[in-house]
């Protein structure tokens, strides 16, 4: 089955942005933190990536015989604000997983690799040029 994603974003008079999808709304705002009314759009993008990775892990864990007692992701992104090559996008992501599980470390690393290949957001980004994704994992027993 094909899946379609439909987002509508509206620029407000105060420069914040309201984005709506499936009757849910989020406020985004690229202004400095002291004036901001919502999450930075690029941070929201990275939050979407993290949520997609976690949802994929949750959906696939039982089939892969992985016990997820707790899972969290921290993503740090890097970009140049004044690039000499004209590329303003993210240059690098560091994705750090913290997995609480009785499984062995090698099982978890293989599982995270599998999840990253199955996650639609990660898979989309992986094919983008001028972009690097680094993944690290912390296993907590």
UniProtKB/Swiss-Prot annotation:
Induction: Down-regulated by osmotic shock and ethanol. Not induced by oxidative stress. Homodimer. This is Hydroperoxide reductase. InterPro entries: KH_dom-like_a/b (IPR015946), OsmC/Ohr_fam (IPR003718), OsmC/Ohr_hydroprdx_reductase (IPR052924), OsmC/Ohrsf (IPR036102). It is an enzyme of class 1 (oxidoreductase). PANTHER family: HYDROPEROXIDE REDUCTASE. It comes from Mycoplasma genitalium (strain ATCC 33530 / DSM 19775 / NCTC 10195 / G37). Its EC number is 1.11.1.-. Belongs to the OsmC/Ohr family. It is found in: Cytoplasm. Disruption phenotype: Mutant is highly sensitive to killing by tert-butyl hydroperoxide (t-BHP) and H(2)O(2). The keyword Cytoplasm applies. GO terms for molecular function: peroxidase activity. Reduces organic and inorganic peroxide substrates. Protects the cell against oxidative stress. One of its GO terms (cellular component) is cytoplasm. The keyword Oxidoreductase applies. It comes from the Bacteria. Keywords: Cytoplasm, Oxidoreductase, Peroxidase.
